[in-house]
Amino acid sequence: MAFNLRNRNFLKLLDFSTKEIQFLLELSAELKKAKYAGTEQKTLQGKNIALIFEKSSTRTRCAFEVAAFDQGAQVTYIGPSGSQIGHKESMKDTARVLGRMYDGIEYRGFGQSIVEELGTHAGVPVWNGLTDEFHPTQILADFLTMQEHSRGKQLHEMTFAYLGDARNNMGNSLMVGAAKMGMDIRLVAPKAFWPEEHLVATCQDIAKQTGAKITLTENVEEGVKGCDFLYTDVWVSMGEAAEAWDERVALMTPYQINMDVIKQTGNPHVKFMHCLPAFHNDETTVGKEIAEKYGMKGLEVTEDVFESEYSIVFDEAENRMHTIKAIMVATLGS
């Protein structure tokens, strides 16, 4: 399968067809295999890439940098305090400046409209490293990881549940990705934390074409039954007020992934996924604060699940690099 994605932006999965997404997943697997075999070809030699981070990051930044270096490209990191974007210079103007200097631009920040504006005016490929609404590079990594742990199933044969805050960028993006790839997704969350109705409707329309099944439920037992994968994310996202914790913890505690929830799947081969970072113990500053305030050593997932044989979170994290590399190679490579 081969598609010409050269000079395309990668802003959200809604912009891509099922076959284009599958192509990117296949390219990711090929590039991963080549890296391990030491046979990787540098198709981005001589390219210059700008990485704009208005929100801090570990995995996304490292994945973009290593992927670029592996492919022979040079990168410039522009951090939260390292530019005039939105302060003295509009994104429209910034896009037109950087587009003259760089061959590709990554953006990680706030509203989806910002990265869309960047993509409209830059004149070079723009890649969404995360916005408040969508996190498309993460979904490619998730689906590659699912394929690697599928026990012979294709994506369209898989069932997975996302538990927790289903209205955040991960809930949105997993729903879109599942709809595109014909998967059975269950969004298991308090009703107030379901995705926006317009996005659900859009995904349901896509599902009619792909055979996907989208279920929104508040019932954990119903939502996880028969799942191949269980997925969660932090309960309070970057940029949200600290005051949100009390209400969020009270609402979300029933949706914690623990060993009881693992057993409720009825699947001894079920796997646990998380985009990271995760609050699974009290070994971080925030983790200690949570343990002291709420008497919980883990929030969205317990330590015994996170460190168990069910967990594939570090395979998932590594795959950020391989899938991001595929996006850059497909849209920018020679």
Swiss-Prot record:
Q: What Enzyme Commission number(s) does the record list for this chain?
A: 2.1.3.3
What Gene Ontology cellular-component terms does the record carry? cytoplasm
Ligand binding (L-ornithine): 169, 233, 237-238
Root EC class: transferase
> What are the record keywords, sorted?
Amino-acid biosynthesis, Arginine biosynthesis, Cytoplasm, Transferase
Q: For binding carbamoyl phosphate, which residues are annotated in this chain's numbering? A: 57-60, 84, 108, 135-138, 275-276, 320
**Origin, by domain of life?**
Bacteria
One GO biological process term: L-arginine biosynthetic process
Catalyses: carbamoyl phosphate + L-ornithine = L-citrulline + phosphate + H(+)
Example GO molecular function = amino acid binding
Metabolic or biological pathway: Amino-acid biosynthesis; L-arginine biosynthesis; L-arginine from L-ornithine and carbamoyl phosphate: step 1/3
Q: Where in the cell is it found?
A: Cytoplasm
Primary localization class, coarse: cytoplasm
What function does this protein fulfil? Reversibly catalyzes the transfer of the carbamoyl group from carbamoyl phosphate (CP) to the N(epsilon) atom of ornithine (ORN) to produce L-citrulline.
Q: Which family does it belong to?
A: Belongs to the aspartate/ornithine carbamoyltransferase superfamily. OTCase family.
Q: Which NCBIfam families does the record cross-reference, listed alphabetically?
A: orni_carb_tr, PRK01713.1, PRK04284.1
Annotated protein name in UniProt: Ornithine carbamoyltransferase
Q: Which organism is it from?
A: Vibrio parahaemolyticus serotype O3:K6 (strain RIMD 2210633)
